Amino acid sequence: MRGDHITLVRNDKYWQQGRPYLDRIIAKFIGAPSSRILALQAGELDYIEYYWFPLDSYKLVANDKRFQTAEVSYPTITHLLINTKQPPLDNPKVRQALMVALDRNYIQKNVFFGLGQPAVSTFDSRIEWAYNPKVNYEKMYPYDPAKAKAMLDEAGIKAGADGTRFTINFLFDSTRPDFLQAAQAIQRFWQDVGVKVNLQGAERAVTLKRVYTDYDFGVTLQTYTTSGDPALGIARAFVTESIKQGSNFNNVSRYSKPEVDDLFNKGRDASSREERAKYYYRVQEILAQDLPTLTLHQDALIDVASVRVHNIFSGGQFPLWDIVWMDK
């Protein structure tokens, strides 16, 4: 059908003789996650890249001898991005209370199917040289709804006659089943401490516009990759120069602190990993107190392919398509 796929044809003049091995690659666009899995099972697809693979199907394909899976080694965190210009979310004490009200281990086990792990910092702990082991949200903000209520009381956010303290508009990408399930779990946890949550699911394009252009949200669920280095993938979520309305995946929380800007800049420019780590360690300590985002989960990115496909997992984040080949 016109418009539902792209066909890539082998370049016979490719610089490396004999490659690529495949005559053509057909990339199909399949919107519904369940339809992608059905197409895989029917043999209509040979490979689903991690971004499009629904995690709720992991056990199904992992236990099927027709398929092979691999976790992509690419540190990625799912954040709850906070609109820090919207009261009472502008108060770090309120954000800390919201973190304490979250059972992130429950979300990891029941939403992300035990894959990945609860995030322990704004820095993915898999970036071992830059992660500060003294910053651990599991220890700093353990799940404790009674304590969260007390923290909100101390912040001056008292419960009304109906038990409600304030209301959050929670925007998420409704095309991702894991985001829907995570949003529903978070709604329950926060409502347990008197915070009413209006869930607002929308398609990705609508969500991105409302978040990054219109700033029309209280909290939103987004996934940020680290791009392999804090200077590339982490700083953009927290430095002042990344507050750019209309530009996606930047500092949409609009958090701004000169000390944090300075530390990220020094961490970027330092000449050794040891020196860079010194600045990044300090910035994590500050962000752990300010919590402009609530880091939810260190994601496991899963690729799946037919066992007929070879060398498909050889390229790290993306396949090296020139060496991929298939059984006939």
Model-derived segments and their meaning:
Residues 3-5, 10, 77-78, 101-131, ...:
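Detector for C-terminal structural segments
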Residues 118-155, 174-181:
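Structural transition elements
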Residues 48-50, 202, 220-222:
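Short beta-strand and adjacent tight-turn residues that come in two discontinuous sequence segments
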